[in-house]
């Protein structure tokens, strides 16, 4: 347990950041899932629009340090490759 005032404040800050990061990670996964569902259904137009909304979110998550930038790039690259294969 944190004893000093600065340690207690650090715990509060970490809890806030953790909640924000969890929310962003969850949102990113939801958008990726929407793209994958559109790909699975074979709807090229829906997959393209879903990818256009998901890609910036994934890259923003990388900028915020939620996922590594290479991981984000890999996810976007693989999704776009699958979407292009539909067209």
Swiss-Prot record:
GO terms for cellular component: cytosol; small ribosomal subunit. The keyword rRNA-binding applies. One of its GO terms (biological process) is translation. One of its GO terms (molecular function) is small ribosomal subunit rRNA binding. The keyword Ribosomal protein applies. Binds directly to 16S ribosomal RNA. This is Small ribosomal subunit protein bS20. It comes from Beijerinckia indica subsp. indica (strain ATCC 9039 / DSM 1715 / NCIMB 8712).
